[in-house]
Amino acid sequence: PQLEASHHDSVCTAVPKYEANVAAIKLLRQLEQEGRSATAQEHAVLSLYTGWGSLVKALDGATTDTAWQARHAELKELLTPEEFSSAIASSLNAYYTPLAVVQAIWSALQRLGFEGGNILEPSCGTGLFLAGMPQEVARKSRITAVELDDVSARMTKAMYAQYGVKVHQSHFERVRLPAGSYDLVVGNPPFGAEQSAELRNVPFAKFSIHNYFFAKALEMVRPGGLVAFITSSGTMDAYTAGHRAYLNSVAKLVTAIRLPGGTFSGIAGTSVTTDLLIFQKREAKAAASYEPKWAELVRVPTSSRICGSSSTALMTNEYFLVHPENVIGKLQSASTQYGGQTVVCKFDGDLAQALQERVAAMPEGIYKARAKSPAAESQKAEVVQLDQWRR
């Protein structure tokens, strides 16, 4: 069965989310003990696992809430020390993607001309981008997935290895993958100010983690290939622009869509402001001009259609003033938990419909499949048949 956009509606609050996570972990233990993959019914249980980003009380032994103390004790007993440490680490910057957003991203990629190929999903969580992949794309694709969190990676294997997906439990920075060999890198990398675990002396080694993922992904795709990520608004709106200059030198920004602040509130329990960014790798590295413009930050005039505030101090990437139709909602100023100010995007409409309207306005057919080679023909037996699972 293919997962519907409403699949996670039952786990939008803390207690059901915790219970679904525990049920998924227990099922994973059973599958591993029995040495088998998940059935379609079991897949539905595993795919309700949404990580621990909004469930810090379950990880916090110092909580004074007696109900969460009991859940914390249950979780400590259920997980090994290594798994528990991995859960804590992943809770800091891992936000699972709503399926409605995943489906819109695949629609966008199809409109751009992507029909299948060699696909990489770094930081895959439990494979929600695989769950939302159209079967006509899956039928023509080979897929590699990378996930740092041990439990999430094992769940992805339990669900998708039977269909040929190759899953690596590793840092994206450390996993050995062939550069320049992928047609598409897609996903929702971690957000955060911390640097990557990159050991090589590359220009992007010290980028913040979400910007690093873009740079590494562009290293992985072939010229003409696509990178489509959900990312923190910091990629577009950070005052420091070194990462934007680097990304622009190796790829063209195809589109940027500012998502509403509540996009991740249900499945991930966070109101972080995010963007959908799609890049196409240039045929050769060049100090290209910013076309479209997206290098600098500018003040948002109160007269702008994207301004939802009387403040004259709102700043955003110049791209969104040139393309206000790509902002889903209106920008406003909000206080951070540390007493500072940030820009949020407020929207009260139908997000799925708004995304499809933006997708319909994207350019058509800019992606061209690579010419088939004898080596590619010999790999047909390895093509991922996710459509079998969907029947």
Q: For each of these PLM feature ranges, what is it?
A:
Residues 3-159, 163:
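Class I S-adenosyl-L-methionine
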Residues 266-374:
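Flexible, glycine-/basic-rich loop-and-beta segments that form/coincide
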Residues 162-172:
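Conserved SAM-binding strand-loop segment of SAM-dependent methyltransferases
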Residues 148-150, 205-265, 272, 276-278:
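Conserved Class I SAM-dependent methyltransferase catalytic core
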